[in-house]
A protein has these predicted regions:
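Intrinsically disordered, low-complexity regulatory regions
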Residues: 1-122
Length: 122
């Protein structure tokens, strides 16, 4: 098996384990609640994680003795893989708790011909 496939399997396992904490059955919180701006909220998470990763990598590049305190480079990269999978799932309308009457940016979808025409600028 290719190593990249193994990495994806590891990411799926991490996602499954973390989801038990973030969307546990004893809470009313659903995954979609974390993304009030839809895919834009997920992109903000990706951006934040990427900036943190750049910061750590630059520190490691400039100081051979530097090591991250809490999260390894591999952990951060796996988080990015999982966040990307959330973005794809959200764009498909398949995130737990996602409102089917809202689009991938969490905007209300037009429901009438007039609303559709107004949305298209006609």
């Amino acid at each position: 098996m290719r190593e990249s496939i193994k990495v994806l399997q590891e990411c799926a396992e991490i996602q499954d384990k973390k989801s038990r904490d973030y969307q546990n059955e004893n809470s009313r919180i659903r995954q979609a609640d974390y993304y009030p701006r839809g895919i834009m909220s997920i992109m903000e998470l990706i951006n934040t994680k990427t900036i943190r990763l750049w910061s750590v990598l630059e520190a490691m590049e400039n100081d051979p003795n530097y090591a991250p305190n809490f999260e390894s480079i591999e952990d951060s990269l796996k988080d990015l893989i999982n966040y990307s999978s959330f973005a794809v799932a959200y764009s498909r309308g398949k995130i737990d708790g996602q409102d089917p009457d809202r689009d991938f940016l969490n905007r209300k979808k037009p429901s009438t011909v007039k609303e559709i025409r107004d949305a298209e600028g006609q």
